[in-house]
């Protein structure tokens, strides 16, 4: 054996074996992101080397899955061994023969001489009489001589005098670890150094087999699990610490993390078990799966990014700490070091990175900057034999079932809290739902886990893939974190060549943290258990308090006051404020609804001020004259107070025009590329940016707290105790100019704004709510009733609603915006959602050629009767349940069964349009007249 063979064996052992992380994924409608690359489709992504122009996906497409166990080719026969070689001794059931020193002179058969040129030692199995190994001398010392077989599957020691064999070891698996060997009786495992002359760690077993596995241990609390065939490593780690519920394990060599759930007798691994034997995976994929940390770094001058994996690309150092370990990953080639702390708490494991501790040797334009990090991003990966699903909080929620056969579908990527809208797309993006909650769930047979991103969530994206996607047989879900974002721009109007620029300066997010909660359940777990665990996290850890005071459902209404419309004045086109729903009309709509039986109405009133109508920053709370002015507004308030109507004046300041002290030149968000962030309409035919309407400016987050303070004062002056902030409870974006506001900082500014408003005794309604808004809002409207519907999804579930029911009052998406309003009513009822309608008082023809022409469906005249009647239906079946949590939700075809904490069972039949509550049937037709929504 030559030195290069030893070097190669050591390198291979470092680059493969017992670890894992996750395979990210690309959401439909986005670029197909392979492995860990987080780049735009225009940016070349290298895999380990910056000069490669193809991304991982292209490389893997060309790389075939050729990973096979190494095999020894025995070319010499037992007869030739016994005839031409010198017998030594029998050791562990094998008789060994040594090559004579003068074999070239004494053997006349040239073919035999050629064979013996590469064979110094041969072993014949005493039981079968067959040659089982041939070996060459590798090294020697004063104690023994080391012999290795050509494929390094056999390791043999002889005494220094070459008189007898003293030890025989056989490799467990070259796919797992080329330095891990077993004794012939399978009682002992030994991990050798790369020179094979020293045992770094040894383990023993009593031979007991459980679930097809054999466990080896040692005095240092290490535990190695082999398949009962002794030819595959299932897992390897040492015990670190424990508490009453959980125990933490780590592999010092590979940084594999294990979390043992004592109650369930379940070990959760950061690496798919037996990953080295994935027959569908390429070497690159196995390395990816075998990495507990993955990183992307960017090179600004080269405008490129490069993937790095802890397996093969990083030196790993493990240090025990109180209740956990700190693992330092040193990516020498990139000049980057990333420390990660893994801490065992009472009922969860936390993985955490303090970005200030990350070391980058060169952060100049010619250096290497960390842009993305993924830690434990395939924790709890499921095999092709497992049964279960991932719970994905996309929109209302969705399930991705393990091994669903959707190999050709794009894997999933969802940006937590939505994508950063400052990076305005050249073409209209696909219409998708948003990830409102920074978490996901794993349900695997009798076990389940809730995973939540507790810090750095504003820069997280959730990825998931099923077996067969990305050339892996595993099902994987996890978080990736963008620590420096990028943007693309085009020079001189050339839209064919995009240039990439990275976010300047230090990483703006201080901490990245993910918690892994194994669930304690008496019965087989499902997604309602995951929802309960997340609800408990919100109330116990995230500062969310229950505000679901109404036991009966509400009727949520969005009124739209006015808009800008071009009219002809003396033949001259003039843009004028135009009423869509005057205050007097709003009162009449409410009265008509009340006359029809509607109760507990909650109104979100958009564009009710002059600033709101004109698109300026809306903070003065001054009623628009075109809607009836201050007197009519006060009359509407008085009516609402007297009739139990909750009125939320809405102010939506995401986009703006100059005025009211804020100007597009100074207060517009700046993109990473350095240009202003302008929001365009898109051409309906071609999907390209339209110039028909002037683009709107995106308001800088730097103004949020100041505006909140002014808004609070003005509302207090006008005795307004409620407000809606429109899209500013769902939209999250940074300002990358002189303000240097990251998404993480923008989230902090939004939370400070919510706090200022609520500290002023003003109640917030959220028109959709990201998780960070939940501690501040009283109730939520426009909660989606479906997911984005990606092909990889198997089923929509009302996960958001299950989390919120009994915690916050909420309504679903607008019934009258749906093409199937009856189904929307029934789905709302099935998910415990109050009903929601959009309405305007004027004819819908008034909307033509205005910014609100998308409200073509919202005629109050057309929908008042239907809204009142469907509310009566909703109240009949959901009365008394508003403060109860949902404990069960199951869909079987068109029948949905919802169970509440007080034992009430609501069965909704979508096809028959009948809802049964504890055995009593309620037919929708008995409440809602046919055609009542389109009589106008």
Predicted regions: what is each one?
Residues 31-69:
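Ser/Thr/Gly/Pro-rich low-complexity, disordered linker/stalk segments of secreted
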């Amino acid at each position: 054996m030559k030195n290069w063979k030893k070097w190669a064996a050591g390198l291979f052992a470092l680059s493969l074996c017992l670890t894992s992380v996750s395979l990210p994924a690309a959401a439909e409608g986005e670029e197909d992101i392979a492995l860990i690359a987080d780049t735009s489709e225009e940016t070349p992504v290298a895999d380990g080397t910056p000069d490669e122009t193809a991304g991982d996906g292209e490389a893997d497409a060309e790389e075939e899955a050729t990973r096979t166990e190494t095999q020894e080719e025995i070319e010499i026969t037992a007869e030739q061994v016994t005839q031409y070689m010198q017998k030594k001794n029998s050791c562990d059931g094998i008789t060994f023969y040594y090559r004579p020193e003068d074999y070239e002179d004494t053997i006349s058969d040239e073919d035999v001489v050629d064979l013996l040129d590469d064979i110094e030692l041969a072993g014949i199995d005493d039981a079968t009489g067959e040659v089982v190994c041939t070996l060459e001398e590798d090294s020697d010392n004063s104690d023994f001589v080391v012999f290795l077989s050509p494929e390094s599957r056999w390791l043999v020691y002889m005494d220094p005098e070459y008189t007898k064999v003293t030890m025989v070891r056989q490799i467990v698996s070259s796919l797992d670890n080329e330095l891990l060997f077993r004794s012939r009786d399978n009682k002992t495992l030994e991990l050798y150094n790369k020179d094979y002359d020293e045992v770094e760690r040894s383990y023993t077993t009593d031979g007991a087999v459980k679930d097809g596995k054999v466990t080896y241990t040692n005095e240092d609390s290490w535990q190695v699990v082999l398949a009962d065939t002794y030819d595959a490593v299932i897992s390897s780690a040492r015990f670190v610490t424990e508490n009453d519920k959980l125990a933490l394990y780590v592999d010092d060599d590979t940084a594999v993390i294990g979390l043992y759930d004592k109650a369930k007798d379940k070990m959760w691994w950061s690496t798919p078990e037996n990953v080295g034997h994935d027959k569908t995976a390429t070497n690159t994929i196995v390395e990816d799966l075998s990495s507990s940390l993955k990183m992307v770094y960017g090179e600004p001058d080269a405008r490129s990014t490069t993937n790095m994996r802890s397996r093969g690309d990083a030196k790993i150092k493990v240090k025990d700490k109180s209740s956990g370990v700190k693992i330092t990953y040193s990516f020498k080639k990139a000049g980057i070091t990333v420390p990660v702390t893994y801490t065992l708490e009472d009922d969860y494991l936390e993985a955490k990175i303090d970005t200030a501790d990350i070391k980058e040797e060169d952060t100049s334009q010619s250096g290497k900057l960390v842009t993305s990090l993924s830690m434990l991003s395939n924790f709890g990966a499921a095999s092709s034999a497992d049964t279960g699903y991932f719970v994905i909080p996309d929109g209302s929620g969705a399930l991705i079932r393990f091994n669903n056969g959707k190999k050709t579908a794009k894997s999933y990527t969802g940006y937590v809290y939505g994508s950063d809208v400052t990076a305005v797309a050249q073409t209209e993006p696909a219409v998708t739902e948003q990830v409102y909650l920074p978490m996901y769930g794993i349900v695997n047979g009798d076990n389940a886990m809730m995973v939540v991103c507790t810090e750095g969530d504003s820069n997280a994206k959730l990825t998931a893939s099923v077996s067969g996607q990305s050339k892996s047989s595993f099902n994987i879900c996890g978080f990736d974190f963008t620590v420096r974002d990028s943007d693309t721009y085009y020079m001189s109007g050339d839209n064919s060549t995009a240039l990439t620029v990275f976010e300047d300066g230090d990483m703006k997010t201080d901490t990245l943290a993910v918690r892994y909660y194994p669930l304690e359940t008496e019965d087989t777990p499902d997604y309602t258990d995951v929802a309960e665990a997340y609800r408990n996290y919100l109330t116990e850890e995230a500062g969310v308090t229950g505000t679901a005071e109404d036991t009966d459902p509400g009727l949520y209404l969005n009124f739209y006051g006015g808009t800008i419309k071009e009219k002809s004045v003396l033949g001259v086109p003039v843009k004028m404020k135009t009423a869509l729903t005057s205050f007097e009309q709003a009162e009449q709509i409410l009265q008509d609804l009340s006359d029809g039986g509607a109760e507990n109405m909650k109104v979100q009133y958009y564009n009710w001020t002059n600033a709101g109508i004109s698109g300026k920053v809306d903070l003065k709370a001054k009623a628009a004259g075109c809607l009836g002015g201050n007197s009519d507004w006060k009359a509407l308030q008085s009516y609402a107070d007297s009739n139990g109507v909750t009125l939320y004046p809405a102010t939506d300041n995401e986009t703006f025009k100059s005025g009211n002290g804020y100007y597009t030149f100074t207060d517009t968000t700046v993109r990473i590329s350095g240009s202003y962030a302008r929001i365009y309409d898109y051409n309906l035919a071609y999907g390209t940016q339209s110039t028909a309407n002037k683009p709107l400016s995106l308001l800088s987050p730097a103004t949020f707290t100041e505006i909140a303070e002014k808004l609070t004062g003005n509302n207090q002056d006008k005795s307004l105790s409620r407000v809606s902030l429109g899209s500013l409870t769902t939209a999250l974006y940074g300002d990358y100019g002189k303000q240097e506001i990251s998404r993480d900082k923008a989230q902090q500014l939004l939370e400070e704004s919510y706090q200022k408003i609520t500290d002023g005794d003003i109640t917030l309604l959220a028109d959709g709510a990201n998780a960070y808004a939940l501690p501040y809002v009283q109730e939520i409207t426009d909660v989606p009733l479906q997911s984005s519907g990606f092909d990889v999804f198997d089923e929509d579930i009302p996960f958001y609603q299950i989390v919120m029911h009994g915690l916050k009052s909420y309504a679903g998406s607008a019934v009258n915006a749906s093409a199937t309003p009856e189904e929307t009513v029934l789905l709302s009822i099935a998910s415990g959602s109050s009903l929601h309608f959009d309405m305007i008082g004027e004819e819908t023809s008034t909307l033509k050629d205005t910014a609100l022409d998308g409200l073509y469906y919202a005629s109050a005249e057309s929908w008042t009767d239907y809204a009142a009647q469907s509310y009566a239906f909703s109240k009949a079946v959901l009365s008394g349940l508003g403060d109860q949590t949902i404990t069960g939700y199951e869909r079987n075809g068109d029948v949905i069964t919802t169970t509440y904490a007080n034992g009430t069972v609501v069965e909704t039949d979508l096809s028959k349009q009948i809802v049964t509550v504890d055995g009593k049937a309620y037919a929708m037709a008995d409440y809602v007249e046919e055609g009542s929504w389109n009589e106008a």
